[in-house]
C-alpha cells in the first residue's frame, strides 16, 4: 500500500495493493484490495469495495462496498455506495448514483441525477442528465436525452436529440434536435430522423405499429 496525505488509508487493516493520495483518500478502507484513489476525500468511505479507481476531489467519496468503478473528475460518482462497474469521466458525472450499476458517463454532468438506473451510456455534455431510474438508454451528443427521467431502452444521437423525452420507452432519435419537442415527451416506440426540432421529421416511424412516414419525395 501507498498513502500520501493526512488520514489517507487511515483505517486499513489487511487491504493490500492500494494507493491513496490526498487528504482522507481511502480513509475508511479496511480489507479492500487494489483501489487507487487520488484527490481530496476521494473514496473516503470505502471499506471493502475493491478494484476501484478515483481521480478528483470527492470522486467515489461515499462508496462503501461498490467494486470495479472508475471515477475521473471532481464529484464523479460521489454518492455511489454499493453499485459496481460504473464509469464516470468528467466533472459531475453520475453524481447522484447510489446503487445503479453498469453505467457509463462521459462529459460534464452526464447522468448527473441517475440513482438506480442501470446499463445507461451517456456521451456528451449533460447527456441523460436528469435520468434517475431509467435503464438501457444511450445518449450521444450535447444534452442528448437530457430530460429523460424514467424512460428506458431509448437511443438518441445528436445535439439535443430526444432532449424533451421524460418517460417514453424504446425510442430512436437521430440528428440535430431530432425529437426535441413536447410531442415526443412521453411517446414510446418512435423513430425520428431529423435535423431540427420539427414535428414533421424527414422520417417518422412507429415500431409498435410497424409504420413509417417519409415527409418528402423518394427518388431512385
Locations of regions flagged by a protein language model:
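Glycine- and small/polar-enriched repetitive beta-structure motifs of secreted/surface proteins
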Residues: 1-219
Amino acid at each position: 500500500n501507498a498513502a500520501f496525505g493526512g488520514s489517507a488509508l487511515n483505517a486499513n487493516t489487511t487491504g493490500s495493493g492500494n494507493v491513496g493520495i490526498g487528504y482522507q483518500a481511502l480513509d475508511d478502507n479496511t480489507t479492500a484490495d487494489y483501489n487507487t484513489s487520488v484527490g481530496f476525500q476521494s473514496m473516503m468511505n470505502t471499506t471493502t469495495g475493491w478494484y476501484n479507481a478515483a481521480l478528483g476531489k470527492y470522486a467515489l467519496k461515499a462508496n462503501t462496498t461498490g467494486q470495479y468503478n472508475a471515477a475521473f473528475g471532481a464529484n464523479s460518482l460521489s454518492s455511489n455506495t454499493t453499485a459496481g462497474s460504473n464509469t464516470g469521466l468528467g466533472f459531475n458525472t453520475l453524481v447522484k448514483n447510489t446503487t445503479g450499476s453498469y453505467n457509463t458517463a462521459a462529459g460534464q454532468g452526464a447522468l448527473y441525477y441517475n440513482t438506480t438506473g442501470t446499463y445507461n451510456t451517456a456521451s456528451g455534455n449533460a447527456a441523460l442528465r436528469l435520468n434517475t431510474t431509467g435503464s438501457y438508454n444511450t445518449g450521444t451528443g450535447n444534452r442528448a436525452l437530457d430530460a429523460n427521467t424514467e424512460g428506458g431502452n431509448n437511443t438518441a444521437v445528436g445535439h439535443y436529440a430526444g432532449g424533451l423525452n421524460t418517460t417514453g420507452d424504446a425510442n430512436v432519435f437521430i440528428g440535430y434536435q431530432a425529437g426535441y419537442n413536447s410531442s415526443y415527451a412521453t411517446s414510446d416506440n418512435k423513430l425520428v430522423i431529423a435535423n431540427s426540432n420539427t414535428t414533421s421529421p424527414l422520417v417518422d416511424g412507429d415500431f409498435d405499429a410497424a409504420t413509417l412516414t417519409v415527409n418528402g419525395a423518394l427518388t431512385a
